[in-house]
């Protein structure tokens, strides 16, 4: 039985934060959603819809929403952060003085801290201190499908097993499976890298390079995930699961993916600024490609696909030139034992 006193505060009223808040509210957890946009918050709290990010989808009437962060967090048993990566540090800095001792913080944000390239768990630990239970929620999950109640599976990773299980229990239900693990680095890496790789697949599809090219890029993209994971302390099985392969396949093939749509637009010849403006929401890959390559270069790992995406997003080369560079690479073994040969060249 759910503890009636267990209250969940969800921070971030975009599509993903709204979807997760609606999910746990439907599971009978007292849930309050915090956001900055007054109109969005009012539409959720009064009309039970997020007119901007999830239009025409009804939300639970029990879900409350507010622009008052202190009110949202007051009395919360744990907090779920679902803001874009560029707002993660600022949000935690505002949150920290409002948290009671022992209140855990989970996040469904994907990416790195902009500028520093730090993993988000490093940022959270620095801001929230060494005693706060932490966890990351990740996996193949489009917000719209979650809100519509379509079957979804994610994974929750954290060092505190009790808190990790608590987060998973709140999300787990008839149409939403929540697995658990303790590889925070691997979970975060997969969630960040898949956005970058999805741009490459989107470009290939926009250029009409065919299904063979799509499959090849996805597979070699997974190879890049595994190679980088091996030198930063992540476990390969995490990247072969929902946090890596699962999220990669969804983001690279699903038309709801903003990063795939960005790549598709670029592949069709659209400018970067026009493509981002047309999408109308944050596209994490634009910033994340720099941070992925920062980690690769610091660790001496070659990531040709990610590097090409970074160059395209910096507008240093055209999408066509990027594909030509990848296709012109010298022939070499596939390195099926890549899990154990972190420094092999792709």
Swiss-Prot record:
* Protein's UniProt keywords contain Nuclease: no
Q: Which positions does UniProt annotate for sn-glycerol 3-phosphate binding?
A: 110, 139, 141, 194, 247, 257-259
Q: Name one GO cellular component term.
A: cytosol
Q: What is its main location?
A: cytoplasm
Q: What is its EC number?
A: 1.1.1.94
Q: Which chemical reaction does it catalyze?
A: sn-glycerol 3-phosphate + NAD(+) = dihydroxyacetone phosphate + NADH + H(+); sn-glycerol 3-phosphate + NADP(+) = dihydroxyacetone phosphate + NADPH + H(+)
Q: Mind listing the UniProt keywords for this protein, alphabetically? A: Cytoplasm, Lipid biosynthesis, Lipid metabolism, NAD, NADP, Nucleotide-binding, Oxidoreductase, Phospholipid biosynthesis, Phospholipid metabolism
What InterPro entries does the annotation carry? 6-PGluconate_DH-like_C_sf (IPR008927), 6PGD_dom2 (IPR013328), G3P_DH_NAD-dep (IPR006168), G3P_DH_NAD-dep_C (IPR006109), G3P_DH_NAD-dep_N (IPR011128), NAD(P)-bd_dom_sf (IPR036291)
Q: Which family does it belong to?
A: Belongs to the NAD-dependent glycerol-3-phosphate dehydrogenase family.
Which PANTHER family does the protein's record reference?
GLYCEROL-3-PHOSPHATE DEHYDROGENASE (PTHR11728), GLYCEROL-3-PHOSPHATE DEHYDROGENASE [NAD(+)] 2, CHLOROPLASTIC (PTHR11728:SF1)
Q: What is this protein called?
A: Glycerol-3-phosphate dehydrogenase [NAD(P)+]
Which species is the source of this protein? Xylella fastidiosa (strain Temecula1 / ATCC 700964)
């Amino acid at each position: 039985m759910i503890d009636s006193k267990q209250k969940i505060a969800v921070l971030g009223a975009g599509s993903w934060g709204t979807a997760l808040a609606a999910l746990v509210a439907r599971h009978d957890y007292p849930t309050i959603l915090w956001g900055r946009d007054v109109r969005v918050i009012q539409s959720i709290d009064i009309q039970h819809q997020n007119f901007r990010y999830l239009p025409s989808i009804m939300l639970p009437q029990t879900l409350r929403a507010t622009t008052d962060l202190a009110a949202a967090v007051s009395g919360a048993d744990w907090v779920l952060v679902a803001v874009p990566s560029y707002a993660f540090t600022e949000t935690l800095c505002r949150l920290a003085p409002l948290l009671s001792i022992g209140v855990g913080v989970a996040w469904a944000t994907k990416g790195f801290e902009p500028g520093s390239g730090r993993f988000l768990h490093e940022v959270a630990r620095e801001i929230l201190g060494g005693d706060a239970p932490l966890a990351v929620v990740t996996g193949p999950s489009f917000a719209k499908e979650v809100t519509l109640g379509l079957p979804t599976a994610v994974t929750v990773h954290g060092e505190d097993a009790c808190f990790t299980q608590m987060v998973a229990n709140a999300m787990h239900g008839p149409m939403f499976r929540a697995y658990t693990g303790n590889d925070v680095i691997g979970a975060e890496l997969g969630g960040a890298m898949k956005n970058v790789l999805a741009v490459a697949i989107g470009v290939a599809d926009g250029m009409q390079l065919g299904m063979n090219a799509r499959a090849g890029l996805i597979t070699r993209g997974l190879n890049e995930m595994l190679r980088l994971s091996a030198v930063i302390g992540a476990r390969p099985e995490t990247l072969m699961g929902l946090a890596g392969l699962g999220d990669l396949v969804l983001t690279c093939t699903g038309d709801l993916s903003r990063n795939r749509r960005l790549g598709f637009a670029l592949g069709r010849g659209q400018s970067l600024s026009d493509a981002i403006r047309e999408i109308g929401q944050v596209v994490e890959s634009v910033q994340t490609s720099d941070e992925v390559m920062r980690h690769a270069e610091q660790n001496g790992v070659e990531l040709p696909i990610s590097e090409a995406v970074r160059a395209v997003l910096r507008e240093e080369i055209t999408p066509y030139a990027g594909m030509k560079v990848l296709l012109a690479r010298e022939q070499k073994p596939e390195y099926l034992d890549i899990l154990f040969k972190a420094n092999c060249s792709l």
